[in-house]
Amino acid sequence: MKTFSAKAHEVTREWYVIDATDKVLGRVASEVARRLRGKHKPEFTPHVDTGDFIIVINASKLKVTGNKTLDKKYYRHSGYPGGIYETTFGKMQERFPGRALEKAVKGMLPKCPLGYAMIKKLKVYAEATHPHSAQQPKALEI
């Protein structure tokens, strides 16, 4: 029996919605990354984007364990000498509620054109409403 290899035009994608209220950041991010990659499907193929679309609502209510609200740091650089900026998880959640989850998921995906295509299937919203009701997403419990 030959090894099965999925073709890009044969992949069927589902839409899922995850409510992140009082969920731990890393646990949500790892499950989202797994589903974006398509590893939960029997037809998973490493070189083909077989993943599903994921909608995360209530991203502003994500939690982290321990003292990471103050201790976890995010860094960025302006490109100029001495132009490094750091932000804590708490400040990031106040200012950009979905960005911490996006950065966590992006770090778990491949760093190649296929990974960049996968991250585009992630939709993160700070509140409970989202504009994707026409796709009839299924609720996914984590």
From Swiss-Prot:
GO-annotated biological processes: negative regulation of translation; translation
UniProt keyword terms in alphabetical order: Ribonucleoprotein, Ribosomal protein
Residue pairs linked by disulfide bridges in the UniProt entry: none
Domain of life, source organism: Bacteria
Family: Belongs to the universal ribosomal protein uL13 family.
Xref: PANTHER family: LARGE RIBOSOMAL SUBUNIT PROTEIN UL13M (PTHR11545:SF2), RIBOSOMAL PROTEIN L13 (PTHR11545)
Function: This protein is one of the early assembly proteins of the 50S ribosomal subunit, although it is not seen to bind rRNA by itself. It is important during the early stages of 50S assembly.
Protein name: Large ribosomal subunit protein uL13
